[in-house]
Structures are given as structure tokens and as C-alpha cells.
């Protein structure tokens, strides 16, 4: 998986393990850890993955769903947009528009990143907490 040079990556790009946890499991662990360690934070997961019928995709688009939207949005100034990938990034792929979404959000003042696994995502959240107002 090729990373865009303008998007901050948390985690090791050289880590390899074919048995590394799936992205969904990493995301659930992140949610549990953030709620446990930082219960005051407001954040949400954007359900923008999976197969959809054309009718469902059209409905979601009409309701404001954006192709490529990040997995997590943490509310604050600036907001943090976090794209979660598997710890072994060779087992992950970019979906269409994900990198473009992050770059556009970054241009508008958001802190954006890709996190390889939940531990890397926690590091990103902790870094963001040091700069947010």
C-alpha cells in the first residue's frame, strides 16, 4: 500500500505479519481504548465501507455520504480525521478517494493521518490532544 508523502502515517511501514488483526478488530479496540482512557472526547466512526446496492449508495450520497471519508472523526479544534489500516499495511488497500479526502481535509485545517493498527491510532489521538484547543 503506497502512502502519500503529505499524509502523516502512525505505525511501522515495515511491520509484517500475515496474521495481523483485521481493520474492524483494530477499530473496535481503538474505540474501547479511547472511551476508557479519554471518556470526555467526542468522536465517531464513519460507516463508509462494505458492499451496497445501487439504491443504498444513491440514498447515502443524497444524505451527504462522501466517498473516501475517513474512518474516524474526532471533534475539536482542529478536528482529527483518522484513517485506520491494518498494522501490516501490505494487507490493506486504499479505497477510491480516501487519500484525496484526507488531503482536502488537511487543506481546510484538519489534522489528518493514517494509523496502522490501534496502538498507532492511539498515538495519533494523543498527539492530536496536545495541539487541540
Positions of the model-derived regions?
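Catalytic phosphate/metal-binding cores of nucleic-acid and nucleotide-processing enzymes, i.e., regions
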Residues: 1-133
Amino acid at each position: 500500500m503506497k502512502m502519500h508523502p503529505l499524509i502523516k502515517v502512525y505505525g511501522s511501514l515495515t511491520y509484517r505479519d500475515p496474521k495481523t488483526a483485521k481493520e474492524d478488530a483494530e477499530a473496535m479496540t481503538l474505540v474501547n481504548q479511547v472511551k476508557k482512557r479519554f471518556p470526555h472526547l467526542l468522536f465517531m466512526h464513519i460507516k463508509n465501507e462494505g458492499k451496497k446496492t445501487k439504491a443504498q449508495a444513491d440514498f447515502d450520497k443524497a444524505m451527504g455520504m462522501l466517498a473516501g471519508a475517513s474512518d474516524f472523526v474526532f471533534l475539536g479544534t482542529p478536528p482529527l480525521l483518522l484513517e485506520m489500516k491494518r498494522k501490516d499495511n501490505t494487507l490493506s488497500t486504499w479505497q477510491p478517494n480516501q487519500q484525496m479526502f484526507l488531503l482536502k481535509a488537511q487543506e481546510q485545517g484538519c489534522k489528518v493521518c493514517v494509523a496502522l493498527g490501534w496502538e498507532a491510532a492511539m498515538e495519533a489521538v494523543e498527539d492530536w490532544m496536545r495541539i487541540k484547543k
